[in-house]
Amino acid sequence: MSFLTLKGNKMIIENQKDAEFSSAFKPSQLAQASRFKRWLASMINGLVLWVMAGLGFALGDFAGVVGMIVYAGFQLYFMKTYGQTMAKRWLGLRVFNYHTNQPVEFGKYIGREIIDILLAWTSFLLIISGIVALVRDDRRSLTDLVAGTIVLKDEK
């Protein structure tokens, strides 16, 4: 249900659900993640993958693939259970929907991670994504812009 309000000499049409959400919204819950913690989370996730796959491949190709699958399984478990990757959970970060300020749904999280993987295959675009996060005031990476997400501190 929408309603009309007057503010000064302007008429504003508001959606009641948006107004209820706005009044319940606490900005302190959505503080921006630091650039360093975002970078560190990426490095931790990459290091864990590198170690699991590297140890596996040291034992043979099949074991390397199993190591990568186990890593993906852990990440999927953390994303489904906690709404965070392992590193984001350890560092107190969470991915939110940029438009609703709500924690991102599992399916959207998976899509976001797939975008990151595709960018990683083209190292140049992954570097560009990091630079985008460095120069933007809201610290959103190219992945965030494409997926409609933002990484914030998890105040829970």
Swiss-Prot record:
Subcellular location as annotated: Cell membrane
Entry's transmembrane regions: 46-66, 114-134
Top-level taxon in the UniProt lineage: Bacteria
Name of a matching Pfam family: RDD
Keyword presence, Transmembrane: yes
Gene Ontology, cellular component aspect: plasma membrane
Main location: membrane
The entry's keywords: Cell membrane, Membrane, Transmembrane, Transmembrane helix
Signal peptide interval: none
Keyword set includes Transmembrane helix: yes
Membrane topology: Multi-pass membrane protein
UniProt protein name: Uncharacterized protein HI_1560
Native source organism of the sequence: Haemophilus influenzae (strain ATCC 51907 / DSM 11121 / KW20 / Rd)
